[in-house]
């Protein structure tokens, strides 16, 4: 996985089984960089409170683990991308 900036937007690019996906690099819970998390298959786990996102869609898989609280969390934006030769182009 790799963190890039496109027109001021922080993007996380992940390779899942040879396919590339792009989502926001900011956790929708507390804004932590997802690129500092752990990618297991297509599931990205944020290091902040262990919220999990599907990098292929940006959908929330597991809510943050915060004792006695039920924090609001949204899906993170996902972006279309195209691979040409050795370049990856992200459409915002």
Q: What is each residue range found by the language model?
A:
Residues 1-41, 59, 72-92:
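N-terminal pre-ligand scaffold of iron-sulfur
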Residues 37-63, 67-70:
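Mid-chain, well-packed structural core segment of small domains
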